[in-house]
Amino acid sequence: MSIEEIPEEIPQGADVTILSKNEKKARELIKKLHLKPVPGITRVTFKQKGNLIYAIEQPDVFKSAAGTYVVFGEAKVDDMNKRIAEAQAQQEQQEALTKAAADAETADKSPESITNDLQNASLEDKTVEEDEGEVDETGLDSKDIEIIVEQTQVSRAKAVKALRAHKGDMVNAIMELS
């Protein structure tokens, strides 16, 4: 009998998980402890100091008679600050699209208004370009700058400027840029 002759019992596209030897042993021990499975839980999170969150998607959760829980699943580190920043960026983008759609309906299409719009856009680009130039980082720790850029999602130049304004104090620089 070859592998081609074995009938497939698993439908295509099904989510199949392969358990390790240690996990199989642990599950057998759980069954011996008479723990009851808790259905309907889609995500378990454990919060640690400093907004560090361990998240387990699609966990297998069991409850003991004493009220303690046993959770099986793959734990992944989840950064809430990054999630919040992504959600805010998406919301701002959505608001900008709705505002642009509303402005497009009411905008004047005369040649003068189009020229004014182009001039305003070119002025905005120049201010951004000036901000992105070479930045003097002497006296500042590059790790501090990278942390501020990561936390506040601003350019490196703005992070350096904020650090200099607060004499190297990262907390106040982040608060200013947030």
Curated annotation (Swiss-Prot):
Region Disordered: start-end pairs: 87-142
Main subcellular localisation: cytoplasm
Residues of the NAC-A/B domain: 20-84
Amino acid composition bias (Acidic residues), ranges on this chain: 127-139
Bias kind Low complexity: ranges: 87-104
InterPro entries xref list: EGD2/NACA0like (IPR016641), NAC-like_UBA (IPR044034), NAC_A/B_dom_sf (IPR038187), Nas_poly-pep-assoc_cplx_dom (IPR002715)
Residue ranges of domain UBA in the record: 140-178
Superkingdom of the organism of origin: Eukaryota
Signal peptide location: none
Cellular localization per UniProt: Cytoplasm; Nucleus
Biased composition (Polar residues): 112-122
GO BP field: protein transport
Pfam family name, one: UBA_HYPK
CDD domains: NAC_NACA, UBA_NAC_euk
Task of the protein: Component of the nascent polypeptide-associated complex (NAC), a dynamic component of the ribosomal exit tunnel, protecting the emerging polypeptides from interaction with other cytoplasmic proteins to ensure appropriate nascent protein targeting. The NAC complex also promotes mitochondrial protein import by enhancing productive ribosome interactions with the outer mitochondrial membrane and blocks the inappropriate interaction of ribosomes translating non-secretory nascent polypeptides with translocation sites in the membrane of the endoplasmic reticulum.
UniProt protein name: Nascent polypeptide-associated complex subunit alpha
Species annotation: Meyerozyma guilliermondii (strain ATCC 6260 / CBS 566 / DSM 6381 / JCM 1539 / NBRC 10279 / NRRL Y-324)
Gene designation per UniProt: EGD2
